[in-house]
A protein has these predicted regions:
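Conserved "HGTGT" condensation-loop signature of ketosynthase/thiolase-family condensing enzymes
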Residues: 1-145
């Protein structure tokens, strides 16, 4: 990101693209985006714009912070474990307590209830102050591989 006061969606988008490249997947292979959702206007807007540019409006996007709070340094690991569980259960959790999404999120598919996770792949974002960006692609294990 450009700065803490003015995050830029381009590095966020590139981070997700690089994760997809490493996984040898395309955006259309991803069935769910687990957003970092910092809860800051600037951070959430940059992440929402980057997700919309890369995945469009059809891929479900939610955050788990409404379920467990922002656990600071542990948030990435805890949310990653929850994403593994969602893949195994083939169900994705909506963002809890999201009553009025910001206008900047209007181009995203924000599920309001638990949905089936049709795809065998998801991407999980984790971002920190100063431009420390991390996106991880998870794929469901199959015995074919």
């Amino acid at each position: 990101t450009t700065s803490i006061a003015s995050p830029d969606p381009e590095p966020v988008r590139r981070c997700m693209e690089e994760a997809l490249d490493h996984a040898r997947l395309r955006p259309e292979d991803i069935g769910y985006v687990n957003a970092h959702a910092t809860g800051t206007v600037q951070g959430d807007e940059a992440e929402a714009r980057a997700i919309e540019r890369l995945f469009g409006a059809a891929t479900p996007v939610s955050s788990l912070k409404g379920h467990m709070g922002h656990t600071m340094a542990a948030s990435g690991a805890l949310e990653l474990a929850a994403c593994v569980r969602m893949l195994a259960a083939r169900r994705l959790a909506p963002t809890r307590n999201l009553d009025n999404p910001a206008p900047e999120c209007s181009g995203l598919f924000l599920p309001r209830r638990v949905l089936p996770l049709e795809s065998g792949a998801l991407i999980k974002n984790n971002f920190a102050l100063g431009g420390v960006n991390c996106s991880v692609v998870l794929r469901r294990f199959t015995h074919d591989e």
